[in-house]
Amino acid sequence: MRTFTPKPSDTERTWYVIDATDVVLGRLASQVAKLLRGKHKATFAPHVDTGDFVIVVNADKVALTGNKEQQKLAYRHSGYPGGLKATSYAELLEKRPERAVEKAIRGMVPKNSLGRAQMRKLKVYAGAEHPHGAQKPQTFEITQIAQ
């Protein structure tokens, strides 16, 4: 018997919506990365994109443990010498909360063309509304013990 290799055309992609209200950022990111990669499916293969689409709503209400809001920094670079900018997560969550969630998830997917394709299936919104109602997304509950 030969080893089964899934084809991208054979993969059925489901849409999931996740409410990030009071969910710890790292726990949220690991669950979303698992759905994006397709690791929850029996047909998972590390070299094929078998993941699902994920919509994260209420990104502005995500929780950070400890004193990370003030201490943890998010870096970006302009590409010019001396162009490294650092922003605290408190400021990032205030101005661009969807970027904070995307940055956490990006660190948990592969750093290659497959990871970039998986990140394109991620949609993050700061508020409770999203424009993907036509896809009929299923609710995905993240169960966590007290933070």
UniProtKB/Swiss-Prot annotation:
User: Which superkingdom is the protein from?
Assistant: Bacteria
The Gene Ontology terms for molecular function here are:
mRNA binding; structural constituent of ribosome
Annotated SUPFAM superfamilies: Ribosomal protein L13
Q: What does this protein do?
A: This protein is one of the early assembly proteins of the 50S ribosomal subunit, although it is not seen to bind rRNA by itself. It is important during the early stages of 50S assembly.
Cellular component, GO annotation: cytosolic large ribosomal subunit
Give the GO biological process terms.
negative regulation of translation; translation
Assigned protein family: Belongs to the universal ribosomal protein uL13 family.
Record organism: Beutenbergia cavernae (strain ATCC BAA-8 / DSM 12333 / CCUG 43141 / JCM 11478 / NBRC 16432 / NCIMB 13614 / HKI 0122)
Q: Which CDD domains match?
A: Ribosomal_L13
Query: Where would one find coiled-coil regions in this protein?
Result: none
Q: Which UniProt keywords apply?
A: Ribonucleoprotein, Ribosomal protein
Q: What is this protein called?
A: Large ribosomal subunit protein uL13
UniProt cross-references to PROSITE patterns, sorted A to Z:
RIBOSOMAL_L13
User: What assembly does the database describe for this protein?
Assistant: Part of the 50S ribosomal subunit.
Q: Which Pfam families match?
A: Ribosomal_L13
By its UniProt entry, which Gene3D superfamilies does this protein fall under? Ribosomal protein L13
